[in-house]
């Protein structure tokens, strides 16, 4: 990417110059206020101007973008295959592993395998988790846990499921939440804003949801309580300007309107917003959705190049297995879990201790979330 700097009087002027001079291949990367002497070196005549850094995409950038799109197409095709096999067979053939006879597992291992399946984890994935947690006991000629059950299963789940445990400490600059209607994106964004601020991050919030007045007012009121800047963007250009105005923030949270993953036109419209800057997109899914609906959402929202997953409404299902299956099969890192409407209490930063407890224990025993955030 070729970098150029221009000096202007306002962000609006910068955008107009960039569009006229560089066209669609350019993006504004950052801006800062500087002072320039108008008459020699006399400091009293220094004028404030805006220095804007512009990135112009070159052939190599387009090649990398093409490669990313090709990888994205492969991921979507793989998800389509998974969905079709789940519809037709109830399982994914490619996950078939070497089955061990029931007598080859120690009794306690069999109990935990049953518990995983009862929690709605796919039998193939449950077997994989159990096998990775076990070693062969030569004396008794059975497979048993390598350590205590919790420790062994935690190590296995850590091997098979990706979590981003550093999301709050080291967030991307711009975090956008997308997902189907009704999964709780706006409430989740408010919870994240509180967590980031609690961890000494300078936070900004931008809403792209121009359809729901109630959601806008709710988020605006919360931003005022947190004392963080809040903006509403009704166009990609306005969004670009607001991102630049919040360039001093450590993390900028972007709320989007809920969209049906079948509404391709609305999704394409949202895509135009995300072309203006380097944005990390996190797909928000309710844990009580059917597994097939989750995969369908991932396929459609996959056009945004998903950086990770957020699972909400864990309090509304006693069977978190579908969530585990999706995380395992897509290998997208999970960044947080939410449960309930209370802000900021009902959120847990993704961590393996919580996930193992969620899978192995009853809902009431894992509900105290704030201690783990």
UniProtKB/Swiss-Prot annotation:
Its main location: membrane. SUPFAM superfamilies: P-loop containing nucleoside triphosphate hydrolases (SSF52540). It is found in: Cell membrane. The keyword Membrane applies. GO terms for molecular function: ATP hydrolysis activity; GTP binding; GTPase activity; signal recognition particle binding. GO terms for cellular component: plasma membrane. Keywords: Bacterial flagellum biogenesis, Bacterial flagellum protein export, Cell membrane, GTP-binding, Membrane, Nucleotide-binding, Protein transport, Transport. GTP binds at residues 179-186, 255-259, 312-315. Belongs to the GTP-binding SRP family. This is Flagellar biosynthesis protein FlhF. It comes from Aquifex aeolicus (strain VF5).
